[in-house]
Every structure is written in structure tokens, then in C-alpha cells.
Amino acid sequence: KKQYKRLLLQPFLEEFNKFGEVKTYWINGEHLYSYKQTWEKGDGVFESQEAIDPELLKKCHETAKKLLNDLSKDHEKLIQCRVDFACCIDNTNVCRDYFINEIEICPTIPEQESRGHGYVPLAQAVLKACV
């Protein structure tokens, strides 16, 4: 850790795994898809956005949209971004107080997350930004 001054090591938080992380994927400020992720024996377990509580998903989308709008005021518009939400640090009760856990500027797009539909919109957005 001492040698790498710009390395962020994120500890595994069991609370995040208990309630799952809601990950929202955006291209050019527009929501493309979301999913919920937990971990089991080192492997990611994914739930599609249809399986996420609609009210929770709506709140996450609204918060992420505000964040992306604020970021674009101070920096260039992000072509791709993933805004992750988590719940309940040091709290084992069921709650819905999700918060922004992570902002990934250039996230990966595994097939199981995007159901195979993430690459075409991303490629189109990149090409449009380059023209």
C-alpha cells in the first residue's frame, strides 16, 4: 500500500453482500440497464433490474442522474459510467437507506450484467463522441 499512492483498496463489506449492490450503467448520461450483485464463494451472483424493488431502483436512477449532471458541470460529459449503490454499513436490519458506494468511469461490461446488449450502444456513443 505504501508504494502505490493512488491505489484504492476497498475492503469486502459483508453488509453489501447481505443486501446486494445495485449497479446502474449509463451511456452519455442515459440509463442503459441496472442489476443487483452479491457474492457467493468468490463468484458474482447477478439479478436483473426486473428483480430489483421498483421504488429502490427509481431512487437509485434519480440519484445517479443528478450525480452525472453535477459531474458534467465540472468535467466533460462521461461517455460511459457505472454508479453503484449499497446499503447498511454496521447495520444488520433490513433497510432501504442506500447510498452511492462507487462511481466507475470506465466500467467493464460482462455479458451476464448487460445480457449481451452493452457493447453496441457503447460503441455507438464512442463513435459519436469522436466525430
Segments from the language model and where they lie:
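Catalytic phosphate/metal-binding cores of nucleic-acid and nucleotide-processing enzymes, i.e., regions
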Residues: 81-83
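Phosphate-binding site of ATP-dependent enzymes
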Residues: 1-74, 86-89, 97-99
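C-terminal active-site "lid" helix and adjoining low-complexity regulatory extension at the edge
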Residues: 75-78, 87-131
